[in-house]
Amino acid sequence: MSDIVFIEQLTVNAILGILPEERITPQPVVVDLQLQVDSRAAAQSTRIEDTLDYADLAIKVQTLIIDGKYLLIETLINDIADLCLSAPEASGVTVEVRKPKALANAIVGLRIYLSLIHI
């Protein structure tokens, strides 16, 4: 069974990029997360302790983005994926990071999928 816990449009103003202006001026960074979990234990116990705490995860992702002052979106997205997979409930994660103001006429970003399950 694979259920999905998702966080969409998590928006943080942060330093991200290699251009001189990107190193000085924070820009919006938008993150979407989809974490594969098995929600049966939480459904049966009705205990919050048996769930993935998405509020806590959102705070951790925001802190990572702001404190990291990343040069490359590739480094950031892999660090976010590793953070998500450190949650014991998560068996896989899709992460999308967008820089909506990087180009005047388009939204750019990167999407990755990582899994703890090896087939």
Task: Show which residues each predicted segment covers.
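Short, well-ordered secondary-structure micro-motifs
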Residues: 18, 44-46, 105-108
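N-terminal presequence-like segments and the immediate start of the first folded domain
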Residues: 1-26
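C-terminal structural segments of small proteins and small subunits
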Residues: 85-107
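Extended beta-sheet lipid-handling architectures
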Residues: 5-7, 80, 95
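Conserved small/polar residues in nucleotide/adenosyl-binding loops
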Residues: 117-119
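Histidine-centered catalytic/metal-coordination loop motif
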Residues: 23-86, 115
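Residue-level recognition of well-ordered beta-strand positions that form the cores
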Residues: 11, 32-36, 96-98, 111-113
